[in-house]
Amino acid sequence: LNLAFNRQERTAESIIISGKERQINIENAPALSIDVEQNIPVLSKADNKKWGVIFGIENYRNVSSVPFARRDAEFMKEYFNKVLGIPTENIYFQTDESATLSEFKTVFDPGGWLAKNAGKPGNEIYIYYSGHGAPDPAGNKAYLLPADGNPNYAAISGYGLDQLYANLAQLKVKQITLFLDSCFSGANRDNETILASARPVFITTTIPSVASNIAVFSAATGNQISSGYSDKQHGLFSYYLMKGLRGEADSNKDNKLTQKELNDYLSEQVNTQARRMGREQEPQLQSAEPERVILQW
């Protein structure tokens, strides 16, 4: 053996392994992607004969919030413009604290913004509302609840559906289509009562009839609640409304979407998902002409 005196020999344990230093890149995880918010298709050209009104109220002064209602409204504005072909300047848009009872009256009352601007023969009007609905227990009437409204005094601080439908019926226009992501049971999207009485059984209201040129898509039936869809960050009804409008509700693939097709799609999808969440929610359509085409592309 060639071992020198006082010389330290290398052993297996003392062998140093060298290598190049490598930089590890850690990329940020992508943000949550909501399909209905991505690549919204342009299905209609801008048409000056089309008008829109959008109210989305998430935060209220006197009652619990409506999760995702403002987000619903913001993206429905894009759908109104790109999918339905409503020019941006023809859309009346208010959210949260700006959507007061005064604003509802300004838009919907006789002689208001809608009547002065859109109330002409040949025009089409689209209305979207996401927020609380409230019942009047005394008269079983249904009200849309503005941001400054109080559900315990819906008759004086809300905007009645019967009043809304009557005012719209006076407009001599071609067609009016409403999308109401609200319920009138006295409960919020978390199935909690919004009334001071805290009744264990929610209230069934009487929904007024509509004129022959008015179609109303409602999120729920009777005393059901209009649910939120946390995974998609939208109201359950609004989420599937957007999916349906972008073409998924076109059941026969003829590039035309009728009221009936949209309602059938909403009924199936919303009801199925609501049951997965342990709830019942059945959208409904009020229309004298369900085969009427909403859009074609």
Each model region followed by its residue ranges:
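Caspase-like cysteine protease fold
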Residues: L3-A4, E9-E21, L32-I34, Q38-K45, ...
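Short glycine-rich His-centered loop
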Residues: N48-S64
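Glycine- and acidic-residue-enriched helix-capping/strand-helix junction motifs
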Residues: Y60-E74, E78, A154, G228-K232
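Stable alpha-helical elements in mature extracytoplasmic
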Residues: A69-M76, T100-V107, G160, L164, ...
